[in-house]
Each structure stands twice: as structure tokens, then as C-alpha cells.
Design a protein with these regions (language model features):
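Short alpha-helical DNA-recognition segment
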Residues: 23-52
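DNA major-groove recognition helix of helix-turn-helix/homeodomain DNA-binding modules
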Residues: 61-78
Length: 81
């Protein structure tokens, strides 16, 4: 898999997680979906960077991926290929 294909695959996964994440607020009301702006606010990464990551135009570093994962309530697992 080329680096470009890897970037696109990571971006697609982030977009999928962002659109399917669920959480419960103080009133126990479930919400689904999250905009790039909401994710940006939660993880501290500019919205235009999130957009570029999702589209595969920007290669996010591990720190940025960790911030995104935490904001989405996920964790990053490293798997040896």
C-alpha cells in the first residue's frame, strides 16, 4: 500500500468515525454524528486540517491522530503487518 493510499484510508476511517460516533450528554440525550467544526473544537485541530486529513491530502502525525481519537472516544491500536 502506498503512502497516498494509507493517507486516504486513514482519512476515510476518521470520516466514518466522526459520522457514527455517539455520546451521552448531561441530560442523557444521545446524539449521532459530529461535524468537522465540532471535532475541531474537541481535539484542538483546525477544521481545514481535519478536512484535508479526511480527504487524504494531509498526512496527520501520531499526535494529531491521538487527539482525534480521544475526541471521538476511540483509541489507536498499532498492529504489526
Amino acid at each position: 500500500m502506498t503512502k497516498e493510499e494509507q493517507r486516504q484510508r486513514i482519512g476515510q476511517r476518521i470520516a466514518e468515525m466522526r459520522s457514527t460516533v455517539k455520546w451521552t450528554d448531561e441530560n442523557r440525550v444521545k446524539r449521532t454524528g459530529m461535524t468537522q467544526a465540532e471535532l475541531s473544537r474537541l481535539c484542538g485541530i483546525r477544521q481545514n486540517h481535519i478536512s484535508r486529513i479526511e480527504r487524504g491530502y494531509y498526512s496527520a502525525g501520531f499526535d494529531q491522530l491521538q487527539q482525534i481519537a480521544e475526541a471521538l472516544g476511540c483509541q489507536i491500536d498499532l498492529v504489526r503487518q
